[in-house]
């Protein structure tokens, strides 16, 4: 028999890995870990750049645009060959959808109203009818009808993802050009959002296509959008009350799929009313050898368009900044500055030119007959040379909690951030999103101009 004293070192050796493993686990359990999104939420996040790109029809291929034009034409003809009075129930909604594809907006409104006002005891597609009606009134530019339809929808149907998407479009339409109407709609929706946040029961199962429960983080972001518009309207006290009510209504425990986007929404909202933070600038694309800078004489207003290098529609929008600057600063006394902030790694330093190879003889070229290689596609920075674009670090996207692009950041004459919101590709059109934001800022927070001020339009450079 082996003496016991000889087995003790072996026992200690065998138990040592177990002890070390226990120690490491104890250390790991005491160290807070960074919360991670669920696999589905991580997948959705990874797909978001593709969704942003595909959502802009201007990014579609010629073949897709031709197919869309054919579909719209056929739907328009099919819509005109029928009348709303021919249909009821689900067939009436199908007809409304057909006419919406054909962009026959007056008929869409008539058909949707026919379904809404019908005496049928069951209207399973009532939310769809309201969605078609409100969307059509946006296309016919009828703000009173948009507000009335949205308020009616809130009272008539459950607040699902379809209702949420419909009201998002209505509020986006109303928020700047018809701010009182937008505030009325926000105020009517807010109790519904707060009640949904306070509900502890599991969400109801999805209903019809497009009608799923609204996630907690979306409810919170929508509620905070109300506070943002209250701030933009010059009522910070009301905004603070709105935020306090939202925070009180939030559940005590949140999953990472909700807590992570809610934290991002909070960070972005917290920027409103604060001075523009320092933004590290890498390169200016406006002119060669120009030192990158942001004019701290903010004029009547300064706006930035922040986006990553993969955003194709953002690049197209940026190429329209110079004509927009000349239009806005064209003699009415306004002084507005616009910049694009291209978030990407710093451009590499150009390598010294190599000694060119000796040209091949005419005889060898004719024998090989090598095809000319196509030029590589231009980078975002190459496409934006000569525009008021500043290259900034990728961390700038995190700094402004930017998830949709381009993110428009507008500041007042004192450098205070007043507006943060994703912008569409038609934002720079005359009278559109940017013009409305600047008009509101110059009215709400006017710049104190010297009596003998020289008109900025006399300057040959509208940027600096």
Regions found by a protein language model. Give the residues of each.
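Structural microenvironment flanking redox-active thiols in thiol-disulfide oxidoreductases
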Residues: 315-382, 391-397
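N-proximal helix/coil linker or "cap" segments that precede and/or mark the start of modular domains
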Residues: 229-284, 295-298, 368-371, 449-456, ...
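Alpha-helical repeat scaffolds
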Residues: 68-79, 106-117, 143-157, 182-201, ...
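Thiol/disulfide oxidoreductase modules built on the thioredoxin-like
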Residues: 382-386, 391-437
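N-terminal leader/linker segments that initiate helical-solenoid repeat arrays
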Residues: 26-90
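Short active-site neighborhood of thiol/selenol oxidoreductases, capturing the structured segment around
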Residues: 290-321, 338-341
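Short solvent-exposed coil/turn linkers within tandem alpha-helical repeat scaffolds
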Residues: 78-91, 102, 116-128, 156-167, ...
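A short beta-strand-turn-helix
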Residues: 280-302, 326-330
